[in-house]
């Protein structure tokens, strides 16, 4: 079954709302125009209605990512929309996409911590503009507030904080169709990209695996050479083996600590729906590091890896550093051992982890050697 990204469902709710606002009856489906002359799609609508004596309208959809394992499945999306006269003085809150279109992040929608601006991809921006442009009204701006009622709760299960996004889910997505990072098709396309990169005449035997779009964004911000980067999904194990088969000599895994800690526990498919051993792994290595039992018990009650890390850093920063250093070394060891199960190889695999504050914090021994050659250093508080 075909699934669509979050921006598509937001645009569908907005389009349903604006149509009832101008007096049309709501329909059970809306046609969404895509970018770059792609064929339009039909998206189901849950409901739409006018509010405040016809001054506003509300459109509601439920996100459906198709067969993809995604925490946005069933997410209820509200878009509240109204026309405001251009001469009218209004709040400066929100993002002006066009002189006639302003978007306001409501409850449960992610905002950048430093600027308070909505976290929205360029694809989502353009999709809103294309689909709402026919409803421009001379002398008025179209204001829409996006609300995800369960957005704050779901955001706690993501790495949004690692990229400076707070208060809810980011409105990201670079295309209409869901890219299934956990699917076999995605794995095969990534292996193909890896082999193509290794076949290039400029290939030097060194690669960097970055985990997801967010990992890629941060790696590029740090100035890491894009010609060495392969963006991966959740199938890390087979990709490590494929790298060894292509005679990669040095491989760096660059990712969020909440993802990579799974490798320290021997889990090489990192999607949270299929395996989530993070707190158990942290506790196991805390025992090996002889961390006091009272602290370990606090880990057990932590709601996330980040919360457990904060507990330890607040109590004993030096012990926290030792624990995460040990985890990074274990990730390297487990990764090399995984490869050797399937392939005879002398590949060196390094692991470097960043935290929710977008700081590179921890690295194993192989990783330290590699990042030093890039001119990067671990950051500390």
Curated annotation (Swiss-Prot):
Gene Ontology MF terms in the entry: cobalt-precorrin-5B C1-methyltransferase activity
One Pfam family hit: CbiD
The entry's keywords: Cobalamin biosynthesis, Methyltransferase, S-adenosyl-L-methionine, Transferase
E.C. numbers: 2.1.1.195
UniProt record, GO biological process: anaerobic cobalamin biosynthetic process; methylation
Known pathway: Cofactor biosynthesis; adenosylcobalamin biosynthesis; cob(II)yrinate a,c-diamide from sirohydrochlorin (anaerobic route): step 6/10
SUPFAM superfamilies: CbiD-like
Family statement: Belongs to the CbiD family.
PANTHER family according to UniProt: COBALT-PRECORRIN-5B C(1)-METHYLTRANSFERASE
Record protein name field: Cobalt-precorrin-5B C(1)-methyltransferase
Gene: cbiD
């Amino acid at each position: 079954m075909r699934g669509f990204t979050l921006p598509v469902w937001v645009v569908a709710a907005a389009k349903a709302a604006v149509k009832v606002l101008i007096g049309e009856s709501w329909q059970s489906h809306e046609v969404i125009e895509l970018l770059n002359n792609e064929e339009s799609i039909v998206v189901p609508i849950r409901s739409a209605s006018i509010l405040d004596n016809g001054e506003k309208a509300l459109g509601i959809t439920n996100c459906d990512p198709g067969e993809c394992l995604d925490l946005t499945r069933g997410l209820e999306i509200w878009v509240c929309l109204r026309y405001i006269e251009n001469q009218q003085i209004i709040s400066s809150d929100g993002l002006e996409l066009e002189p006639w279109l302003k978007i306001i992040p409501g409850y449960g929608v992610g905002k950048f911590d430093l600027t308070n601006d909505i976290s929205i991809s360029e694809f989502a921006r353009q999709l809103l503009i294309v689909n709402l442009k026919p409803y421009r009204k001379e002398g008025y701006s179209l204001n829409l507030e996006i609300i995800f009622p369960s957005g704050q709760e779901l955001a706690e299960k993501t790495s949004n904080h690692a990229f400076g996004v707070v208060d809810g889910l980011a409105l990201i997505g670079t295309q209409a169709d869901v890219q299934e990072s956990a699917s076999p098709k995605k794995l095969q396309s990534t292996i193909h990209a890896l082999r193509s990169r290794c076949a290039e005449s400029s290939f030097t035997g060194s690669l960097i695996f970055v985990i997801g779009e967010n990992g890629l964004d941060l790696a590029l911000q740090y100035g890491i050479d894009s010609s060495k980067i392969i963006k991966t999904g959740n199938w890390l194990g087979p990709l490590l083996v494929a790298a060894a088969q292509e005679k990669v000599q040095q491989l760096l895994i660059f990712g969020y600590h909440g993802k990579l800690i799974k490798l320290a526990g021997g889990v090489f498919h990192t999607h949270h729906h299929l395996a989530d051993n993070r707190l158990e792994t942290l506790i196991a290595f805390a025992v090996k590091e002889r961390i006091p039992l009272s602290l370990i018990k606090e880990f057990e009650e932590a709601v996330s890896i980040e919360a457990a890390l904060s507990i330890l850093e607040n109590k004993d920063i030096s012990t926290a550093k030792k624990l995460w250093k040990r985890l990074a070394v274990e990730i390297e060891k487990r990764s090399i051992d995984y490869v050797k199960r399937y392939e005879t190889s002398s590949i060196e695999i390094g692991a470097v982890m960043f935290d929710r504050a977008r700081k590179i914090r921890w690295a194993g021994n192989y990783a330290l050697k590699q990042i030093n050659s890039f001119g990067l250093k671990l950051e500390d508080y």
